[in-house]
Amino acid sequence: MAKTQIRNGTSIEVVSEDGPLPINVMMQEGVKALTKILSDHLQDGQSVDNESHSMQFVFKNVNDALDEANYQNPEGNGDVKISEIKSDGESDVVNFEVQDMKRKTLDEDDSIEEYITDPQLHLDGDKGEIVFDYGSEIITDNPEGIGERISQMIESVLPNGFPRDSRGRLHAVVNGDELNITEETDIDVTYSNEPVTSGYIDGIEYNEDEDSYEHDGCCPHHHHQTQDQQNNRQYHHHHSRQTHSQSQHPLSKQPPTSSKYRNYNYHDYNYEDDQESIPVGNAPNFSMLMTGNHNLCLFCEYYMVFGEAPKNMIKWYNKNYGYDRLPQSSARNGNSRKSNR
């Protein structure tokens, strides 16, 4: 039979499928447990008020009549009264009226958490509040828009940004072959007899003025220079490009090396010793970034904090942005295998 509800209370129906049940068994086992449950958690956890509640047991095929009786809950939480027996043919109905004597003085405004011992399922106040901070900017659902945002964040920390090709795509995507970082060597570059002109080379745009390009007040640690150069450009991040006439070599049996194709983006990771930098192996010193007098690129910041140049990062950057022309994919794979031997 279904569970029925009464005003400000709950009716619980118990059905026996196997014939008559002794009332003393039900009283000792069932009523004891159910009255305790009703006393503590009626109507989905709401505290018991001062009114009475009833529960109903239905026993199928019960032929013996039960006299009206009172049952005192051993827990002392309330009285159980067998009020009546109703017969509807195949089943008899026994109504038990439960009146809670202990909780009459409870304040109706008391929180339900007082009676529940599982804090993980019933959190109160700030403990039950989960805050997701998405920031003040709206994130677009367009995948291209998300990619553009990520590209802007990455580009903001690169020394020279991301070069783009004629269609506006990032050069790192156009030339996105997997990089196999090994020890630094001058890898062979497949020679091309095609003339090189000002414009786009492998997706990188440049102009003739970049031959003498330098960042004023930036990156004092990068390129390996002579003492005169260091005196004259102590705090210049200098990028020197091989002129196009120098990068074009006549046909010969020995292919040119990659150093002939370095452009102004190329970074030397052989940093000069700096007394201000921390010894290698010591804990990072981020205060170096606060006391510096000059703007630093990402690699120099790493060097100042950790005391050594990020060689693998610089190799990756040079591989993608430090050359006017790069080897073909097949040649690159061959050179990678050579350097891994």
From Swiss-Prot:
The keyword Cell division applies. Keywords: Cell cycle, Cell division, Cytoplasm, Cytoskeleton, Mitosis. One of its GO terms (biological process) is mitotic spindle assembly checkpoint signaling. Transmembrane segments: none annotated. The keyword Signal does not apply. It is found in: Cytoplasm, Cytoskeleton, Spindle pole. Its main location: cytoplasm. Residues 211-264 are annotated as: Disordered. Residues 250-260 have a biased composition (Polar residues). GO terms for cellular component: cytoplasm; spindle pole. Belongs to the IBD2 family. Part of a checkpoint which monitors spindle integrity and prevents premature exit from mitosis. This is Protein IBD2. It comes from Vanderwaltozyma polyspora (strain ATCC 22028 / DSM 70294 / BCRC 21397 / CBS 2163 / NBRC 10782 / NRRL Y-8283 / UCD 57-17) (Kluyveromyces polysporus). The lineage of its organism: Eukaryota, Fungi, Dikarya, Ascomycota, Saccharomycotina. The gene is IBD2.
